[in-house]
Amino acid sequence: MSETIFEPTDHPHRRYNPLIDQWVLVSPHRAKRPWQGQQEKVSEEQKPTHDPNCYLCPRNKRITGEPNPDYHQPYVFKNDFSALLEDTPAPEQSADPLFQMSQARGESRVICFSPDHSKTLPLLTALEIEEVIKVWQEQLRELGQKYQWVQIFENKGAAMGCSNPHPHGQIWANSFLPNEVAREDVSQRNYYEKHGSVLLVDYVQKELEKKERIVVETEHWVAVVPYWAVWPFETLLLPKVHVKRLTELTDAQAKDLAVILKKLATKYDNLFETSFPYSMGFHAAPFNGEDNEHWQLHAHFYPPLLRSATVRKFMVGYEMLGESQRDLTAEQAAERLRALSEVHYKER
């Protein structure tokens, strides 16, 4: 009786994520299963450059009644429904190990990427994205003086819970290290102490050599579908050399970041020729007074779409109770994204 040879594109297997010390189940044989479940609504109506009913457009009133300025560049303001407050008092300490609280202070801000209501990141020019990056850097410098963690992120599309269609991101600063970041901190620190090198710097060099998971590459940056990806078309955006924070980028690296953000976001939109939903955000060294040499700047992109513009992946059942699972292999997803044009389908 002949022994079956393992084939990663056919056989179930687990892949290890060294960044958060967790495993993901890969089930490539399920990729062709029929789908009769929920489908997302797709709206391709042409948005105006200015919507008089939008709370975020220039000159309009926000939901609080406060007017927006007639802004022409990226615009930052305090979130009208902040998840964190600056003056939160500390709770009383509990002696009961099962009922613990800790103080949570912080600030929540919104950044409108541009005054144009119709232009998401891939539809902005690289120069316009550079302006967004400059604002990110300014916010990090300011908030990093008061808080140990500053989270820059974007929820794009209604499928990701975005409550306003005007292209915007958020900036949350807090007095504590969030769970996901704390896991990354421990893993990167342990790797650095064991190997004397930076985990994600070593990882990016190996991905550059292997090439099979690369989606987009520029002079200073590379976007890959990580070996351990959970979401179908998840990507990890990395600088090619050691950089701890966005504020430490050279001018050339910052300009090139704008280029690769536009290219990556364009490929996402081109995949199903729709405004591709995702949650994305940057992780970088905390502002905790340590040297943090073990940290490497990176950005996660978590898009939910799986088979088409209307079929998304759900994190339910086994994934909530056991561990994350995916059907497409990371290599298959990267191949599909890599083959797509870097010219947006609306601009051809």
Question: PLM features: what roles do these ranges have?
Answer:
Residues 280-284:
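Acidic/histidine-rich, metal-coordinating catalytic segments
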